[in-house]
Amino acid sequence: MASMITVDFENCFIFLLLCLFSRLSYDLFFRKTKDSRAGCALPPSPPSLPIIGHLHLILFVPIHQSFKNISSKYGPLLHLRFFNFPIVLVSSASTAYEIFKAQDVNVSSRPPPPIEESLILGSSSFINTPYGDYSKFMKKFMVQKLLGPQALQRSRNIRADELERFYKTLLDKAMKKQTVEIRNEAMKLTNNTICKMIMGRSCSEENGEAETVRGLVTESIFLTKKHFLGAMFHKPLKKLGISLFAKELMNVSNRFDELLEKILVEHEEKLQEHHQTSDMLDMLLEAYGDENAEYKITRDQIKSLFVDLFSAGTEASANTIQWTMAEIIKNPKICERLREEIDSVVGKTRLVQETDLPNLPYLQAIVKEGLRLHPPGPVVRTFKETCEIKGFYIPEKTRLFVNVYAIMRDPDFWEDPEEFKPERFLASSRLGEEDEKREDMLKYIPFGSGRRACPGSHLAYTVVGSVIGMMVQHFDWIIKGEKINMKEGGTMTLTMAHPLKCTPVPRNLNT
C-alpha cells in the first residue's frame, strides 16, 4: 500500500503566483548563503527559472507525464528545484534498483507531516511515520493480522461475499439497462471489503455511514494536493503554505476522529462483553490496553491506520479496476481470450473465486499489465542522510521521487512499452524463479520497493484479479460513443480524466 499523494498544479497556479513575491523577499533579505560541498556535484539539472526553479515544466501536463518527458530529454537521474524544494527525480530501473538496494534504510522515511496532530498526514499515520519502531511494529502486525497469506486466507469469505454482492449490483443495473460508473462502484466494493476485514462489518449504507467514509476519503486525498504544495517551501514560507489549508485539514481529521471513536467504543464494549477478539480492530484495541505489549500504540495511531487503509486501500484498487477494464473493453481479442480461459477453468455457473486465480495465468497477466501501464502512483521518500548515487552528491533531506510510470514504460526494458500486451508476463513467468524475481525488482515496481514498499500488494492483486475476472466472465460491456477516452488525469495518483461509464449486459443468468 503505498502512500497515494495527489496534486493538480493547474488549480494551484494562482496560489503559486501569490507566493513569488514572498519567496523573492525571503531570498533577498533573510536567507543565508551556504557553502557548497567541495568536490561534489549534484545530479544534472534542466534549465530553470529564477525563484520558481523547474515548476514551469510540470504545470500544465499530468505530473507523471511531465517527469517522464523531462527525463527523456535530460536523463534518468536529475536534480530539480521547485522554489526552495529540492527533488531527485529517478526514471531509470537500474538507478531505482541501486537506490533501494544500497540506500534502502536511508530512503525508508517519507516527508515529514504538515500538521502533527492530524489523523490525515499526521505523525500518527503509518504511511507517513519515519522508519523506526512504530513503522516496523505496525507492518509486522498488518502482515500477521490482515495482509499476509495466512491472514488473507482467514478473510477469504469476506471478500467472496462482497464479490457476490458486487455481482448482484451489476446484474440489477444490467436488467434495468442502467449505466455503471466503474470507479464509483469499485470504490464501494473496496471500501466495504476493507471495512469488513478490519472491523468485522461494512459501513452502513442505510444510516449514511458508508457515504460519510467515502466522502472523507475523497476529501483526504484532495487535501494531499495542498500538502504537497505547502511542502515545497522551507521555513518561514512553509508555515504560510500549510496554514492556508490547516483549518480544512483539521476539519476533515476531526470528522474522521468522531466517526472512528464511535467505532472504537463499539468494539471496546463488545470486547468487555464477550472477552474474545474476532477482527483486526479487536486485536489493536487489545494491544492498546496491554501494558506489556511489544509496542505501546496510541488511540490516534489506531485511528490513523484506519484512515491510511481506507485512503490507500480503496482508491488504488478502484483505479486499477477501472483502468484495466478500460483496456480489456478496448481490446476485444484480449477479452475473448480471457473469457475462454475463465470458462475452461471456472465454468459459467459460478463466480470466479480467489482460489481460481493461480489457475488463471492470463487473468494474472492482465492485472499485471494494467498495473504496469497505469501504476497507482510514484514512490516519494526522503534521503535521511547525505549519500552518493551514481557518483553524484545527494544532500540530506532531499526528496526522492521515483517515477514508476516512466520506469514501467522504459523502452530499454519493455518491448512496445505503450501497448497493452498481457502476453509479456506469460513469457516472464517461464523464466526461472530467481531470474523472474530479479527482473521484477529491476523494472516492475507498481507498489514500490524496499522495506517501505506497500504491504498490501498481494491483497490488491487478489481483489483486482477476482473482480476483473467476474466482470468479464458474466457481462458484456457497452460504451457510449465510438471509443473509450483514455486521457490521464493531472494528478500524482494516476486516474482517468474521464471516468469509465458503460452498460453491463448479462452473458448468462445461471450463476
UniProtKB/Swiss-Prot annotation:
Q: Which UniProt keywords apply?
A: Heme, Iron, Membrane, Metal-binding, Monooxygenase, Oxidoreductase, Transmembrane, Transmembrane helix
Q: Which SUPFAM superfamilies match?
A: Cytochrome P450
Required co-factor(s) are:
heme
Q: Which top-level group of life is the source organism from?
A: Eukaryota
Picking any one GO biological process from the record gives: positive gravitropism
Q: Does the keyword Membrane apply?
A: yes
Q: What is its EC number?
A: 1.14.-.-
Q: What is its main location?
A: membrane
Write out the residues that bind heme: C454
Upon gene disruption, the observed phenotype is:
Increased levels of thalian-diol in roots.
Q: A Gene Ontology MF term for this entry? A: iron ion binding
Name the enzyme group at the top EC level.
oxidoreductase
Q: Which GO terms describe its cellular component?
A: endoplasmic reticulum; membrane
The note filed under miscellaneous reads: Constitutes with three contiguous genes an operon-like gene cluster that is involved in the thalianol pathway.
What is the role of this chain? Converts thalian-diol to a desaturated thalian-diol.
> Would you identify the family this protein belongs to, as annotated?
Belongs to the cytochrome P450 family.
Protein's name according to its UniProt entry:
Cytochrome P450 705A5
